[in-house]
C-alpha cells in the first residue's frame, strides 16, 4: 500500500517554534536555482542508462539503530522504488553504513565506501542519509566532488551547513564542500535550535544549576554544547568544567565516580547529549543510583525504545526533546498518514524519524519529476536545493541557502513510568 505523502507543520521564525497545524493540500512544486551557477564538477553528469535512475540511502542497519532505520527505509522504498518519471524507472538501494566492529553503530570506513560506491554509479542521482551527523562529515565531500545531492532525514549537527559560535569547528561548513557549492539538505531542525529549546524548558521548570555531559561524538557534543551555551545566556549556571559540556567515556563499565562528581556540584538538572548506542543505559542507571530525584534531560539521539530498555526504571522521569514533530502530534493529512501507517503495522506508531524519511524521499521524487533532465545530477540537485513549499507528511518543506529546513517545531516529552514517553508541549525559544 502506498501511503499518502501530504501532511502539515506550521513554519516559524528562527528559534521560534510554533505548534503544528495542517495545510489543505497545497502545491508540490519546487523550483531550482538555490544551487547557483553550475560548477565544473557538475558538467557532463548525465546518467548512462536510457531507462533507470538510481537512488540510494546510507543508514545504520544494525544494532539499536534499526528501531529507527527499518521504518525509514520502508518509507523511502515505498515513496520512491518503482516510480516512473518519463522514460525512467526509479530504483532504490538500501546501503548499511554500520558494522559489527563498531558495535552496530555507524562506521566511518563503511560510510566512505558507500559514498564512493554511489559516486561511481553514473545513474545515481540522490543519496538519502545519513542518520548520524559524524557520518555526514565524511560523505558530503565525496558526493560534492561527484555532483550528487544528499538529503538527510536525521542529521542535526549545525556545522554541516552553518557556523555556530561555541558549537561548530574551525573551517566548518566550508571544508565539506570542496566544489564550492552546496549539495546537502536536511528536513530536520538543527541542534542549536533543539539545545536552546531544551535549556528554555529546563528554565521554565525552575532549574538553576546544570551539569552537561556528551558522548564525544559529533551529534552528542554539538547538542550538549548548544544546550550549555543557551543555558548560560538565560541564567542557568552550568557547573560542568569551563561552563560547557563534558565528555563521558562510552566504553566505561562504571559511572559511579561521574555521578558522585555531579552530585557534589549541586546541580539540579543533568543534560546529556548522546545516541543510544553509547552505553547510555549504564550511564542513566549510575546517575539515578546516586541521585534518585534529579531531573535528567536529553535529546532525540536517545528518543527510542532501545534506550529505555537499556536504562530500565532509571529512564523514568527523563525529559526528552525531538527536533521535529513526533508522529503522535501530526495533524490533518499528517495524521491521516500516521493512521494509515498504524493500520499496516499492528496499530504501532511510526518511530520518531519515520515521517522525516518519507519527507526526504518526497523531496527527492519531486526534484526528479520536475528536473529538465531527470537523469542529470545537476538538474536534480538544483531541484532539491531549491525546494520551496513542498507538501510532505511533516508539512511544507522549504530549504534556505544553506540547505537547512525553514521553520519547524521542537517537541517536548516526558518519560513517566513506561515507553513511549508522553507529549508535554511544543517548545518556544527566543534569543
Model feature map: region roles:
Residues 57, 118-131, 149-154, 209-214, ...:
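Periplasmic-binding protein-like
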Residues 104, 117-120, 169-290, 328-332, ...:
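Extracellular/periplasmic Venus flytrap/periplasmic-binding protein
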Amino acid at each position: 500500500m502506498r501511503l499518502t505523502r501530504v501532511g502539515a507543520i506550521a513554519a516559524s521564525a528562527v528559534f521560534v517554534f510554533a505548534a503544528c497545524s495542517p495545510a489543505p493540500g497545497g502545491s508540490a512544486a519546487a523550483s531550482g536555482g538555490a544551487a547557483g551557477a553550475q560548477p565544473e564538477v557538475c558538467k557532463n553528469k548525465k546518467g548512462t542508462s536510457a531507462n533507470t535512475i538510481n537512488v540510494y540511502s546510507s543508514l545504520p542497519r544494525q544494532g539499536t539503530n534499526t528501531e529507527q532505520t527499518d521504518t525509514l527505509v520502508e518509507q523511502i522504498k515505498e515513496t520512491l522504488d518503482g516510480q516512473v518519471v518519463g522514460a525512467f524507472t526509479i530504483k532504490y538501494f538500501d546501503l548499511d553504513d554500520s558494522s559489527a566492529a563498531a558495535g552496530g553503530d555507524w562506521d566511518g570506513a563503511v560510510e566512505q565506501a558507500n559514498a564512493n560506491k554511489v559516486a561511481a554509479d553514473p545513474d545515481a542521482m540522490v543519496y538519502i542519509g545519513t542518520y548520524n551527523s559524524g557520518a555526514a562529515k565524511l560523505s558530503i565531500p565525496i558526493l560534492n566532488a561527484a555532483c550528487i545531492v544528499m538529503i538527510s532525514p536525521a542529521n542535526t549537527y549545525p556545522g554541516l551547513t552553518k557556523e555556530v559560535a561555541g558549537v561548530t569547528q574551525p573551517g566548518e561548513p566550508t571544508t565539506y564542500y570542496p566544489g564550492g557549492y552546496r549539495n546537502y539538505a536536511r528536513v530536520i531542525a538543527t541542534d542549536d535550535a533543539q539545545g536552546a529549546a531544551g535549556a528554555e524548558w529546563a528554565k521554565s521548570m525552575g532549574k538553576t544549576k546544570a551539569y552537561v555531559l556528551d558522548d564525544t561524538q559529533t551529534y552528542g557534543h554539538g547538542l550538549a554544547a548548544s544546550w550549555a551555551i543557551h543555558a548560560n545566556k538565560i541564567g542557568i549556571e552550568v557547573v560542568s568544567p569551563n561552563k560547557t559540556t563534558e565528555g563521558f567515556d562510552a566504553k566505561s563499565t562504571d559511572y559511579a565516580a561521574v555521578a558522585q562528581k555531579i552530585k557534589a556540584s549541586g546541580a539540579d538538572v543533568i543534560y546529556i547529549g548522546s545516541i543510544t548506542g553509547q552505553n547510555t543505559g549504564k550511564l542513566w542507571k549510575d546517575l539515578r543510583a546516586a541521585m534518585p530525584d534529579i531531573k535528567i534531560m536529553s535529546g532525540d539521539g536517545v528518543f527510542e525504545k532501545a534506550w529505555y530498555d537499556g536504562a530500565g526504571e532509571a529512564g523514568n522521569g527523563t525529559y526528552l526533546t525531538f527536533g521535529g514533530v513526533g508522529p503522535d502530534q501530526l495533524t490533518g493529512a499528517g495524521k491521516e498518514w500516521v493512521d494509515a501507517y498504524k493500520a499496516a503495522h499492528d496499530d504501532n506508531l511510526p518511530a520518531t524519524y519515520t515521517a522525516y524519511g518519507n519527507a526526504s524521499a518526497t523531496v527527492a521524487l519531486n526534484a526528479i519529476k520536475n528536473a529538465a533532465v531527470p537523469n542529470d545530477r545537476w538538474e536534480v540537485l538544483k531541484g532539491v536545493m531549491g525546494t520551496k513549499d513542498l507538501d510532505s507528511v511533516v508539512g511544507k518543506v522549504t530549504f534556505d541557502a544553506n540547505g537547512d529546513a525553514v521553520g519547524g517545531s521542537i517537541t517536548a516529552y516526558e518519560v513517566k513510568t513506561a515507553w513511549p514517553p508522553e507529549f508535554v508541549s511544543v517548545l518556544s525559544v527566543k534569543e
